[in-house]
UniProtKB/Swiss-Prot annotation:
Domain IQ: 644-673
Keywords attached to this entry: Calmodulin-binding, cAMP, cAMP-binding, Cell membrane, cGMP, cGMP-binding, Ion channel, Ion transport, Ligand-gated ion channel, Membrane, Nucleotide-binding, Transmembrane, Transmembrane helix, Transport
Location of the protein in the cell: Cell membrane
Protein name (database record): Putative cyclic nucleotide-gated ion channel 8
Gene3D superfamilies, alphabetized: 1.10.287.70, Helix hairpin bin (1.10.287.630), Jelly Rolls (2.60.120.10)
InterPro entries with a match to the protein in the record: cNMP-bd_dom (IPR000595), cNMP-bd_dom_sf (IPR018490), Ion_trans_dom (IPR005821), RmlC-like_jellyroll (IPR014710)
Organism, scientific name: Arabidopsis thaliana
Function per UniProt: Putative cyclic nucleotide-gated ion channel.
Region (Calmodulin-binding): 624-639
Regions crossing the membrane: 112-132, 146-166, 200-220, 234-254, 275-295, 403-423
Disordered: region residues: 731-753
Amino acid sequence: MYKSQYISGHREKFVRLDDTDSRVSMSSNATGMKKRSCFGLFNVTSRGGGKTKNTSKSFREGVKIGSEGLKTIGKSFTSGVTRAVFPEDLRVSEKKIFDPQDKTLLLWNRMFVISCILAVSVDPLFFYLPIVDNSKNCIGIDSKLAVTTTTLRTIIDVFYLTRMALQFRTAYIAPSSRVFGRGELVIDPAKIAERYLTRYFIVDFLAVLPLPQIAVWKFLHGSKGTDVLPTKQALLHIVITQYIPRFVRFIPLTSELKKTAGAFAEGAWAGAAYYLLWYMLASHITGAFWYMLSVERNDTCLRSACKVQPDPKVCVQILYCGSKLMSSRETDWIKSVPDLFKNNCSAKSDESKFNYGIYSQAVSSGIVSSTTFFSKFCYCLWWGLQNLSTLGQGLQTSTYPGEVLFSIAIAVAGLLLFALLIGNMQTYLQSLTVRLEEMRIKRRDSEQWMHHRSLPQNLRERVRRYDQYKWLETRGVDEENIVQSLPKDLRRDIKRHLCLNLVRRVPLFANMDERLLDAICERLKPSLYTESTYIVREGDPVNEMLFIIRGRLESVTTDGGRSGFFNRGLLKEGDFCGEELLTWALDPKAGSNLPSSTRTVKALTEVEAFALEAEELKFVASQFRRLHSRQVQQTFRFYSQQWRTWAACFIQAAWRRHLRRKIAELRRKEEEEEEMDYEDDEYYDDNMGGMVTRSDSSVGSSSTLRSTVFASRFAANALKGHKLRVTESSKSLMNLTKPSEPDFEALDTDDLN
């Protein structure tokens, strides 16, 4: 078995060896070695008789090998093994065999289905060829419509023949290989032809026979006017007979197309239009039958009226246009032929005793005598659609058996069409609103449950708001399950398309490599939050890290190291929360217990975000060590609310310490100046003591001044000590705990090792 593949842009051919081929190749190789060795030895040892001996020996070996080859070929023919390949091998095969699931062939099959629909719709046009010519008082054939109809039928038959030719070159799946997967394709042309000839060839051959064209062309190229009657009857029987193989072939074709392509019409509106087209086609066929049978009943009325004429045979002959007797007015009774049409066989005449039944509307309206095809076609189409839709309830039939059977067929056909076609069309249209109906059912169940559990009104409003917001965002589609059911490679590409640009908007992931971003995108899950929803509360375990895509959130903490501490921040698009989980995931020494949240996060508006769960984040952090980098650490610190709060408090405390040192420096300078002034006063008093005579009054004033200075110095020292004690206590209260972070140095060392 030969197999060809494209390698580096070139087609390479390989050979698959069977057991029989292996035996033949081994024997041939061994023989070849013997021949080479024998020829080599005998050529060296002898030049004469040895050559003749070796030649006869090699001839015997060749005959032996040939007989074994013939036996192998005979076994392969008798075993009946069918050559089968996989569809991938057929694409590079040199044989002109088509894969049944190839896109080009699927397009051909769709076009062939359309051609079958057109063929079924063109065939009823033959029923419009007979016409009652009131101007000539005869029944004739519309020649222009006959040429147009036969041309359309021939074009469709040519396309049908092309389809039949393709059937001989279209592979099929071997039934024995359908155990698993698509199976193997049979590419043997003989097997393909045998399968087609035994299954659908006879049906296709009968359906494509140009019998209506032959009947019409025979009439158009004939010279006898009496050919109108046999042509009319032949068309009626031929079209009805050929409808059977055409419908029989159409049903398996559509089922085969559904197996290979999945569905003929993928969209809901396309499927509804497809079944509506079939309903209109059934109405068209019914209207064409009604027109043809109306002409037949008019013909029956005229033939019955001719029975009372002097020469009934001649009367019947002149009823059809083109008869030679129509031009001779030698007999008196021929002049009374118009009375047959106007009086005896007119649906409007009171003298007519013929009951047309359901065909009276066609005769009285003049449709059977109209030469305008479009108006005639529309009227008959409306009649068929009206009676199929009402199941023939408005039909007033006569006692004629054919008319009664036709009315019964209309009622049964209308019932079947309403059950099948209209039911399928309704199914397609309902698929457009199936999600909306599911949402209504879920909302009703939710309302019943809330009423049963007596939930307060505020909780009910929150539940309704969340359901409404989720419906508006997802339209009832479970996106996560849809994506998870796809293959891993396709799932990764879809996640990358949906999440990559959004993830890159998060500063923490802006500068990471593609592999890490793919791993993060693959594990992100969409989350929706309504207004006033608490995403996480302070002190609760953090089980996911949230990356905001749209909306605004409030982040609040009261853990500031002192009572009454309160810090509030706003989160917007591009921010994240749950950063304690990232610190926990990056720490190789972290336990299984999840970290506690240091902040309370509340949604201020409707929020769309992507969530990364704890285990997924732990896996990404453990698999990709590039996450442990200084740049990530600095970005994380800059955008983390916990680190921002600690940094703000740290800067605030440093600023206060700076202010206290500055105030202390100013106070120290003031005290030094006061001491210098006090020393100057003492020095002045000591120097002036011997020169001035002290009186009691001067001694008293000096001692009073000295006491005042000592008292002010004592008060200043006491106030300074109190301020120092307050400063130390406030310093200890404002000393916030630094947020925990992993040892990046150890991780970097591990990476280097």
